Curated annotation (Swiss-Prot):
One cellular-component annotation, GO: Golgi apparatus
Residue positions, PTM Phosphothreonine: 59
Domain SEP: 141-206
Ranges annotated as biased composition (Basic and acidic residues): 38-48
Disordered: region residues: 1-26, 38-63
Species this chain originates from: Rattus norvegicus
Quaternary organization: Interacts with VCP. Does not bind ubiquitin.
Expressed in which tissues: Present at high level in brain. Also present in liver, kidney, spleen, testis, lung and heart (at protein level).
Phosphoserine carried by residues: 56, 66, 231, 234-235
Similarity section: Belongs to the NSFL1C family.
Its biological purpose: Adapter protein required for Golgi and endoplasmic reticulum biogenesis. Involved in Golgi and endoplasmic reticulum maintenance during interphase and in their reassembly at the end of mitosis. The complex formed with VCP has membrane fusion activity; membrane fusion activity requires USO1-GOLGA2 tethering and BET1L. VCPIP1 is also required, but not its deubiquitinating activity. Together with NSFL1C/p47, regulates the centrosomal levels of kinase AURKA/Aurora A during mitotic progression by promoting AURKA removal from centrosomes in prophase.
Example GO molecular function: ubiquitin binding
Full protein name: UBX domain-containing protein 2B
Length: 331
């Protein structure tokens, strides 16, 4: 009896030391880990159906593209040696940044596209998800350069914007989320924006020297209180098509300026005015050029930052809108 009693606890101990069969919970965890490993392997392989198919002998920059016609497009490019605002680039990368061939940045074969191939349509908010779009839908209208300095950032050749300013912090937060900043959305009604980022973290802001840009086509110089239009028609014929002089009397003895007007329907007008013309003259020009707005109640606002031009008796020079873009908004 004593020996039998001693053997029974040993048998129970051997049974308890045997591995128990896996439960349903164990199987679920194992499958989840297997799935995660498989997805990591897939994500490490280039997908030829997206912009990652564009390769470069060197480490390519990162670029994020948004082709939403309502909110415009957003490109984020980081130079290979970039060390600035690592978190900014990291979070942008998480919202769809893809490597692109550096050569596509300087290609001028197709003026309507900044690169060939697909990109990502970025949501304008948390609720609007990003999605892949194809190259034929990528349009470019306004190109903006965001330079990140050690003491702030600048847009194109504009003034320094300190990081400590809450408005500027909000701008960068939108970029980090892969969204088009609100102040740029106001510029792209019916068109698109290309936003490139340059790394200057090791330098303090350097005010650029004024210079003329020799290129054919249109663009905008952003960053000051109001953007400047940089427009160089490739031929007199094109200039005649883009600038309507019939509706406005020009005094050649007085300085002139070009105003681009983005209409509420998404179209735009470019007109040459004297600096002494008034805001009311701009309104009259819109109505003469587009009679359908004669019975429409609308306002005129500056584009960057947005400010309503309430006093229409003010001259264009006094309103500080020479060589700028103004927007028509329906009431």
């Amino acid at each position: 009896m004593a020996e039998g009693g001693g053997a029974e606890p040993e048998e129970q101990e051997r049974r308890s030391s045997r591995p128990r069969p896996p439960s349903a919970r164990d199987l679920q965890l194992a499958l989840a880990e297997l799935y995660e490993d498989e997805m990591k392997c897939k994500s490490s392989k280039p997908d030829r159906s997206t912009a990652t198919a564009f390769k470069s002998p060197r480490t390519p920059p990162l670029r994020l593209y948004s082709g939403d016609q309502e909110y415009g497009g957003l490109h984020i490019a980081q130079p290979p040696t970039g060390k600035i605002v690592n978190e900014l680039f990291k979070e942008a990368r998480e919202h769809g940044a893809v490597p692109l061939n550096e050569a596509t940045r300087s290609s001028s074969d197709d003026k309507a596209k900044s690169f060939t191939g697909g990109g990502y349509r970025l949501g304008s908010s948390f609720y609007k998800r990003s999605e892949y779009i194809y190259g034929e839908n990528q349009l470019q209208d306004v190109q903006i350069l965001l330079r990140l300095w050690s003491n702030g950032f600048s847009l194109d050749d504009g003034e320094l914007r300190p990081y400590s300013d809450p408005t500027n912090a909000q701008f960068l937060e939108s970029v980090k989320r892969g969204e088009i900043p609100l102040e740029l959305q106001r510029l792209v009604h019916g068109s698109q924006v290309s936003l490139d980022m340059e790394d200057h973290q090791d330098q303090e802001y350097i005010k650029p020297r004024l210079r003329f840009k020799a290129f054919s086509g249109e663009g905008q110089k952003l960053g000051s209180l109001t953007p400047e239009i940089v427009s160089t028609p490739s031929s007199p014929e094109e200039e005649d098509k883009s600038i309507l002089n019939a509706a406005v009397l020009i005094d050649d003895s007085v300085p002139t300026t070009k105003i681009q007007i983005r209409l509420a329907d998404g179209s735009r007008l470019i007109q040459r005015f004297n600096s002494t013309h008034r805001i009311l003259d701009v309104r009259d020009f819109i109505v003469q050029s587009r009679p359908e707005f004669a019975t429409t109640d609308f306002i005129l606002v500056t584009s960057f930052p947005s400010k309503e031009l309430t006093d229409e008796s003010v001259t264009l020079q006094d309103a500080d809108i020479l060589n700028t873009v103004i927007l028509q908004q329906l009431k």
